[in-house]
Design a protein with these regions (language model features):
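Bacterial N-terminal signal peptides that target proteins for export
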Residues: 1-8
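Hydrophobic helical h-region of N-terminal Sec-dependent signal peptides
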Residues: 8, 12-16
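C-terminal motif of bacterial Sec signal peptides marking the signal peptidase cleavage site
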Residues: 20-21
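OB-fold single-stranded nucleic acid-binding module
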Residues: 24-148
């Protein structure tokens, strides 16, 4: 479990460094929808980019906010944008209201890094088998979130 957490931390750090290099105003040319994101992350690589999706559900767990592309986070087709509660708070200020309610059933564009993450009970995800992975897009700043 320690190796998994170390690899996840390293991948998250790499994605944060990649995001820091991007301005909040920069929108990369290639925009990935949830199906593209699932396909691009099959090799368990970190995929930085611009992602477009409609938020169908919002979950909060361990001070993290998950914006889901599917009604259930257990759906294997789900791609979740993961942001910290601090980023969600900054998004509340930026968009002038309760960000979690504002994005529900709306199309969003985010700049971040996507990767497959092994599902485990510590993350609050029910494990179906040992090859169970979920796809997350890590976004580190509210300025990297755009409503459409």
């Amino acid at each position: 479990m320690t190796v998994r957490k170390t690899l996840l931390s390293l991948a998250l750090f790499t994605s944060l460094v990649a995001q820091t290099a991007c301005s909040g105003d920069l929108v990369l040319e290639k925009r990935l929808n949830p199906a593209d994101t699932l396909r691009e992350t099959t090799n368990r690589t970190v995929v930085p980019g611009t992602f477009v999706m409609t938020v169908k559900s919002v979950n909060v767990f361990n001070k993290m906010v998950f914006l889901n592309s599917e009604d259930s986070y257990l759906d294997r087709a789900n791609v979740a944008v993961q942001i910290t509660s601090a980023v969600a708070y900054n998004a509340d200020i930026r968009f002038g209201g309760d960000f979690r309610k504002m994005v529900l059933n709306r199309k969003i564009l985010v700049i971040g890094s996507a990767m497959k993450v092994g599902a485990d009970l510590e993350q609050g995800i029910i494990v179906n088998n040992k090859d169970d992975y979920r796809t997350y897009i890590f976004v580190s700043r509210a300025s990297n979130i755009f409503l459409r």
